[in-house]
Amino acid sequence: MNWTEKPDAGYRITRMAREDLLGIARYSEIHWGKDQRNRYLKSLEKRFEWLALNPKAGRRRDDIANGYYSFPHGQHVVFYLISGQMIDIIGLLHKEMDILVYFHSRE
């Protein structure tokens, strides 16, 4: 799966979010196998496309940084920014992760 840019789908994936996706893919494959990994990654891709069409559906996360949005998906939370007619996927965190530590440790 190509996790760089999908401008035709209305979203871009930052380097940090690509690293998160790779970690999710590795973990999923080790614990649940390739088929489940592929299903979950495909469901994330569909979520990104849906968020690109419905960017305001997410929760504003100005508590983290101005302009951040989040939307839950499975065991993870998708973080993104609205950039004109597109969204930028900026991070994918497990729902149990410390959000502030995640974003501030990667600045």
Residue positions per predicted region:
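Arg/Lys-rich, positively charged N-terminal/basic patches that mediate binding to nucleic acids
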Residues: 1-41
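Conserved N-terminal glycine/acidic-rich loop preference
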Residues: 16-24, 67, 76, 100-101
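Hydrophobic pocket/interface hotspot
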Residues: 17, 44, 89
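Charged, solvent-exposed alpha-helical segments that act as regulatory interaction surfaces
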Residues: 30, 34, 53-57, 98
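Gly/Ser/Thr-rich beta-alpha loop segments that engage phosphate groups in nucleotides
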Residues: 35, 60, 93
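Basic/aromatic recognition patch in beta-strand/loop cores that engages polyanionic ligands
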Residues: 45-46, 56-87
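Enriched for short, Lys/Arg-rich terminal
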Residues: 81-107
